[in-house]
């Protein structure tokens, strides 16, 4: 038997975690009624948890017992940080040596270009995650404990904090997500903060933390500190800020007079709700306004934001902010008749452009295929089916109401789409392809008419 490549181990790791979770969720103990959940629904729930999507066929609060909810949030944490990162954390706890093979797996799972400093980075990720989720849980508890009591209030706070940070979008306090809290600033800004921090990526975290220490300890000017950020951080923060602002403005304009969403809200509340919708579409899945009631214009903006998603090495899905930046600046370089792509006075390697194009094309193929199949087997409207499939592929979790009514075929389609969205269609293609030897022959170039 041939040794598995790192990418194959990662693909298999997610599959094993999903199937193990589905078996636990299919047990009678996992439901409040004590009756076993149909396996397809248990598999759907395990997949949406591990893939940190948030599309649900059974209401998390009322259907699942505390045991079932604990299984779900454990799967969310594993899926958000990655199977390999969690496994490495267990090695730390057991004081086991991290081998070269383990380091290669970590590098592949996080999409890093080097193995230098991997082990300290994983330690910082695990510690940072615990601190951020802990702070989030405390803030949620200030709202949940007065409403639900200490026991369930604390449990709901922990559950929602992990879910928000991992960009899963699942909660156990309402059957309408966070719509009851549309005017609550603590709930809104706590959730948005966790979503953004989870979606920025762990590499960006490192730069931000080091920059913060330089400002506080060494009194380094903010401008100089920003100049010292790595190339990746500058791109991620710039694109993330632009997309949040872009989405907020458009959704505010398109929903301002919509009686089913924001018309009854005050001006500050409309801005808050628009900001939340812009942030949550970046693969989180919580909602403070009903997605089915959005105008078509807002739905299109939301789908665009969903497709882009978060940033590399983070908990979010989508094609990623860096991919968008490379493609946008590629178009600008063509318009300016420049031979290379330049961002922040740095040239982007040609192989990254090829990879960015491949990511976009493969994701579009998967998306069109899943929409077509869903239209054939579930007969939903075109907009609802598109919204569902974009949400599944980008691991967002927002729906216009299609998920609970999916047929078995529809559930299989969405399960497959969520898995592909989490591991990445390119990773799947690489995992099933043969590893080719490096070609020693370079063929001559030939021009084409475009």
Where are these regions (language model features)?
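Membrane-proximal intracellular helices of multi-pass ion channels
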Residues: 1-450
């Amino acid at each position: 038997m041939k040794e598995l490549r790192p990418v194959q181990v990662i693909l298999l790791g997610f599959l094993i975690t999903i199937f193990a979770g589905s078996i636990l969720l299919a047990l009678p103990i996992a439901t409040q009624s004590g009756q076993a959940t149909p396996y397809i629904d248990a598999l759907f729930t395990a997949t949406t948890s591990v893939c940190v999507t948030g599309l649900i066929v059974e209401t998390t609060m009322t259907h699942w017992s505390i045991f079932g909810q604990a299984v779900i949030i454990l799967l969310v944490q594993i899926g958000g940080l990655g199977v390999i990162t969690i496994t490495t954390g267990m090695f730390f706890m057991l004081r086991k040596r991290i081998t070269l093979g383990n380091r290669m797996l970590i590098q592949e799972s996080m999409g890093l270009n080097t193995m230098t400093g991997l082990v300290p980075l994983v330690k910082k990720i695990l510690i940072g995650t615990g601190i951020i989720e802990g702070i989030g849980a405390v803030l949620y508890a200030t709202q949940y404990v007065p409403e639900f009591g200490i026991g369930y209030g604390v449990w709901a706070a922990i559950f929602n904090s992990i879910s928000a940070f991992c960009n899963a979008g699942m909660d156990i306090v309402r059957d309408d997500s966070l719509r009851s809290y549309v005017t609550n600033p603590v709930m809104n800004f706590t959730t948005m903060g966790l979503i953004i921090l989870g979606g920025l990526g762990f590499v960006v975290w490192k730069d931000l933390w080091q920059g913060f220490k330089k400002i506080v300890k060494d009194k380094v000017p903010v401008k100089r500190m920003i100049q010292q950020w790595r190339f990746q951080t500058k791109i991620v923060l710039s694109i993330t800020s632009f997309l949040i602002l872009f989405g907020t403005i458009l959704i505010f304009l398109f929903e301002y007079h919509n009686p089913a969403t924001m018309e009854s809200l005050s001006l500050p509340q409309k801005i808050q709700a628009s900001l939340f919708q812009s942030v949550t579409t970046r693969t989180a899945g919580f909602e403070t306004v009903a997605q089915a009631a959005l105008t078509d214009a807002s739905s299109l903006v939301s789908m665009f934001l969903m497709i882009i998603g978060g940033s590399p090495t983070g908990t979010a899905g989508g094609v990623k902010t860096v991919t968008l930046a490379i493609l946008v600046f590629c178009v600008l370089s063509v318009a300016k008749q420049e031979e290379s792509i330049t961002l922040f006075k740095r040239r982007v390697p040609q192989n990254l452009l090829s990879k960015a194009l491949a990511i976009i094309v493969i994701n579009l193929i998967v998306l069109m295929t899943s929409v077509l199949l869903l239209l054939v087997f579930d007969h939903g409207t075109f907009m609802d089916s598109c919204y569902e499939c974009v949400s599944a592929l980008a691991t967002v979790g927002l729906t216009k109401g299609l998920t609970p009514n999916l047929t078995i075929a529809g559930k299989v389609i969405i399960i497959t789409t969520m898995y592909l969205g989490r591991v990445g269609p390119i990773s799947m293609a690489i995992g099933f392809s043969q590893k080719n030897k490096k070609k020693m022959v370079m063929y001559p170039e030939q021009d084409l008419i475009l």
